[in-house]
């Protein structure tokens, strides 16, 4: 509250509060009341509910927006019990962020920088034994007013030896507080099956700041994951899991979710993966209990995806969206904009494509990418033509810049790029996505599907809101629609398929090309780099 900008926070970030109010169904005044009275009341309760003085060490792990609440409670504990050692760690304390937090917030005694499995236990043992003069590598401390730190460059190599998380205290306290009125029916269990990113080891996505200094991919064996999920499900009486892996081990598709599918389990699982999944893989995930996934779809522009180093194409993203819809898997995705080297054409292509995709799940949001610490854009900005202008705007309203070096604790940053994209195109694309989201939230939900008869297919197109259409396609168009249904096909593959199913009829390449052009113009097929993919979903449930 000593920050002179603190009072301006709600006004400066009014659009954020308005969006939060819409999503939560609460008025903005509710959040003002929560900050002004609810948070202090909670801190008072937290200090009285637990005898903090009985402990020698109190630890906090902090990620994203957990920071201020954790620092506030830690200060109260330290003020009342000065002999208690306060230890911080987590993603918000990686790299120089941890060292600056330790310097600025004097009630913090130690910071674990990076992974803590091999560092935190010996630190606690040394504190308990009164041997705090020799600290493990990777632990920062304060000595005679100076910050002392020797980095630990060794990654935690025995990730497979970690067991399932222990949620006993959490659920016991939730029950005591009456926090589970649904009797645990909505209970969700978080689980980590792997750490790091196997794609990032080879190609670090240019905007991504996840994994910090621990990109190396490490994963538990599928059999171990099965055993641990079984244990957690039984112990905490829940079949809902959220895998916190940045990207799942691809072995999990068949060897984990394939097993769940074969056993006909009724699970509800969230995963993060890559979008270049085949139809069969999405089917296996869905039948194995995946109800929602984040496949890293960030754009529908080939040039932008190349700029990000995503290693996927718009066609693969569209495939993922289509088969996820067919198998009832919610997809969490976004359209990111504002990249270096992007052009008006990148925007026009997406503006042209989106009307074809209105029946598919829309992105959750659209906007300029965040410039995140640890990303290639942050570590090598000049290589990409980026000028970092300072920490994210919100930091100066949350932390007092007279006390904290915001450049050192910030995770996201403001930046400038020499944009050449027309503001009108930016707004047109943004509005198109807003309209797409509105259609899906309304009773007028778009659709595009086809049914198969003995010798023709019928396409039902409800993407245009004012004129839904029913179109019959006889052979050879019907064959093309079916051939390109599961995966993209080239003209040569389509021509060969027609020859097999043509009952002696011959179609020369020119006539096939005309048919393809007509189906693309109708937005029944999507064409990309010489391949064609059917956008309509089959009504048949046996694919």
Give residue ranges: language-model regions:
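Long, charge-rich, low-complexity alpha-helical segments
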Residues: 471-543
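N-terminal [4Fe-4S]-dependent radical SAM core
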Residues: 142-194, 454-473, 519-543
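Canonical Radical SAM [4Fe-4S] cluster-binding loop centered on the CxxxCxxC motif
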Residues: 183-223
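Flexible loop/turn segments at secondary-structure boundaries
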Residues: 66-68, 94-96, 120, 147-148, ...
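Conserved SAM/AdoMet-binding glycine-rich loop
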Residues: 57, 83-87, 222-332, 337-352, ...
């Amino acid at each position: 509250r000593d920050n002179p900008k603190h009072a301006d926070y709600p006004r400066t970030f009014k659009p954020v509060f308005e969006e939060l109010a819409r999503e939560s169904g609460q008025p903005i005044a509710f959040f003002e009341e929560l900050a002004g009275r609810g948070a202090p009341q909670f801190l008072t309760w937290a200090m009285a509910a637990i005898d903090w003085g009985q402990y020698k060490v109190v630890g906090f792990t902090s990620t994203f927006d957990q920071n201020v609440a954790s620092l506030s409670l830690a200060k109260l504990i330290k003020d009342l019990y000065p002999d208690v050692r306060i230890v911080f760690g987590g993603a918000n304390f990686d790299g120089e962020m941890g060292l600056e937090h330790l310097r600025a917030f004097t009630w913090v005694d130690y910071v674990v920088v990076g992974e803590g499995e091999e560092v935190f236990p010996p630190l606690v043992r040394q504190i308990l034994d009164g041997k705090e003069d020799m600290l493990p590598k990777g632990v920062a401390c304060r000595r005679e007013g100076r910050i002392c730190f020797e980095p630990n460059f060794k990654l935690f190599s025995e990730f497979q030896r970690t067991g399932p998380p222990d949620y006993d205290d959490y659920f016991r306290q939730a029950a005591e507080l009456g926090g589970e009125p649904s009797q645990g029916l909505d209970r969700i269990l978080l689980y980590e099956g792997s750490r790091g990113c196997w794609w990032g080891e080879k190609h670090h996505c240019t905007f991504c700041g996840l994994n910090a200094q621990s990109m190396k991919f490490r994963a538990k064996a599928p059999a171990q994951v099965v055993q641990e999920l079984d244990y957690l499900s039984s112990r905490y009486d829940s079949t809902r899991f959220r895998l916190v892996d940045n990207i799942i081990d691809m072995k999990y598709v068949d060897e984990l979710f394939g097993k769940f599918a074969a056993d006909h389990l009724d699970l509800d699982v969230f995963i993060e993966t890559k979008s270049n999944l085949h139809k069969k893989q999405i089917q296996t995930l869905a039948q194995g209990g995946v109800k929602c996934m984040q496949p890293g779809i960030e754009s529908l522009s080939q040039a932008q995806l190349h700029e990000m180093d995503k290693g996927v194409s718009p066609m693969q993203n569209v495939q993922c969206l289509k088969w996820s819809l067919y198998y009832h898997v919610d997809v969490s995705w976004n359209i990111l904009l504002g990249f270096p080297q992007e052009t008006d054409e990148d925007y026009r292509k997406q503006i042209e494509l989106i009307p074809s995709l209105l029946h598919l799940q829309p992105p959750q949001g659209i906007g300029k990418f965040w410039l995140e610490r640890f990303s290639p854009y942050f570590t090598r900005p000049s290589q990409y033509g980026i000028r970092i202008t300072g920490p994210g705007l919100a930091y100066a309203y949350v932390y007092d810049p007279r006390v904290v070096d915001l450049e050192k604790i910030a995770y996201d940053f403001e930046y400038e790029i020499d944009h050449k994209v027309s503001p009108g195109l930016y707004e047109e694309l943004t509005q198109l996505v807003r309209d797409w989201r509105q259609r899906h939230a309304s009773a007028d939900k778009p659709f595009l599907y086809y049914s198969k008869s003995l010798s023709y297919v019928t396409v039902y197109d409800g993407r245009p809101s004012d004129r839904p259409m029913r179109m019959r396609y006889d052979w050879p168009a019907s064959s093309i629609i079916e051939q390109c249904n599961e995966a993209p096909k080239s003209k040569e593959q389509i021509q060969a398929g027609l020859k097999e199913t043509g009952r002696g009829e011959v179609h020369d390449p020119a006539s096939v090309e005309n048919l393809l052009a007509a189906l693309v113009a109708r937005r029944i097929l999507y064409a990309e780099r010489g391949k064609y993919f059917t956008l309509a979903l089959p009504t048949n449930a046996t694919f």
